[in-house]
Amino acid sequence: MSTITAADVNKLRQSTGAGMMDCKKALVEAEGDFDKAIQILREKGQKVAANRSDRESSEGAAVSFINADNTKGAIITLNCETDFVGKNEAFVTLAKDLVERAINFSNKEEFLASDFNGITVAEKLIEQTGVIGEKIEIGGFEILEGAFVGSYVHVNKIAALTAISAPIANAETLTKDVSMQVASMGADTLSYKDFDPAFVESELAARIAVIEKDNEEAKRLGKTLKNVPKYISFSQLTPEVIKQAEEDAKAELKAEGKPEQIWDKILPGKVQRFISDNTTLDQEKALLDQNFIKDDSKKVGDYVKGFNVEITGFKRVTLG
């Protein structure tokens, strides 16, 4: 049997990331054969992975990578079982290594099948499952290209990408701010104009059903009833609807005894409140129609207009 030296153990540890004792045991079992020892460690990983395949892996790290000319970005989540492992330096380093490789692929399946120092990425994850002792897998995987792409990562839990139409002077600031918005608030589409009318109607019906059910219970308990909405998107607010809202506001002011000469100062605010109260779907799911988190006096779309560019895409991944 070959003599196993500390240098041999350290070399295997550097190659696989396995613990010192695991590396020594593998080298002893392999009688000093380095390649065989690596295979032994991988087989251990496969056994651990098989035993933990049904475990929930909702912890981990969300990471991002942008290429040198800011025209392409990647975000992934590397998932594990516990927050303790998710915060481990070696684990986060692996996540960052993986996302730098991920940028060269269009989807997660291609990436998992790609080479990682002689084995596939999928096999590397199995290997690391054996090393760490927890289920390790790629969760979220998103790629985004554009004239300029920027990113934002929130405490290694959520990552977002934003692409804009031109590489302007303040592109990094804009894309980071919008990515922060995407990470914090989420969004399904860019604008309310992208909503299918049938989707809006189905959402409205679903929300009305929930509110009416809640109101039945509130009425039974003698509590205040919730308002049942007629509209939830600006796409439903026709000029006639807006005009009627203005007329209703005038009637309200008249009933309150407000002098007509001050109505022009009050009406815009009331109409704007009507619009805000009846566009909840837009505020939840349409990025440009959300209140900007860094200045809620304006919409994201208003903030973006100040840069004279357009948002051409956005992506988001999150743990859990």
From Swiss-Prot:
<comment type="function">
    <text>Associates with the EF-Tu.GDP complex and induces the exchange of GDP to GTP. It remains bound to the aminoacyl-tRNA.EF-Tu.GTP complex up to the GTP hydrolysis stage on the ribosome.</text>
</comment>
<dbReference type="InterPro" id="IPR018101">
    <property type="entry name" value="Transl_elong_Ts_CS"/>
</dbReference>
<keyword id="KW-0963">Cytoplasm</keyword>
<dbReference type="InterPro" id="IPR036402">
    <property type="entry name" value="EF-Ts_dimer_sf"/>
</dbReference>
<protein>
    <recommendedName>
        <fullName>Elongation factor Ts</fullName>
    </recommendedName>
</protein>
<keyword id="KW-0251">Elongation factor</keyword>
<dbReference type="Pfam" id="PF00889">
    <property type="entry name" value="EF_TS"/>
</dbReference>
<comment type="similarity">
    <text>Belongs to the EF-Ts family.</text>
</comment>
<dbReference type="InterPro" id="IPR009060">
    <property type="entry name" value="UBA-like_sf"/>
</dbReference>
<feature type="region of interest" description="Involved in Mg(2+) ion dislocation from EF-Tu">
    <location>
        <begin position="82"/>
        <end position="85"/>
    </location>
</feature>
<dbReference type="InterPro" id="IPR014039">
    <property type="entry name" value="Transl_elong_EFTs/EF1B_dimer"/>
</dbReference>
<dbReference type="GO" id="GO:0005737">
    <property type="term" value="C:cytoplasm"/>
</dbReference>
<dbReference type="GO" id="GO:0003746">
    <property type="term" value="F:translation elongation factor activity"/>
</dbReference>
<keyword id="KW-0648">Protein biosynthesis</keyword>
<dbReference type="InterPro" id="IPR001816">
    <property type="entry name" value="Transl_elong_EFTs/EF1B"/>
</dbReference>
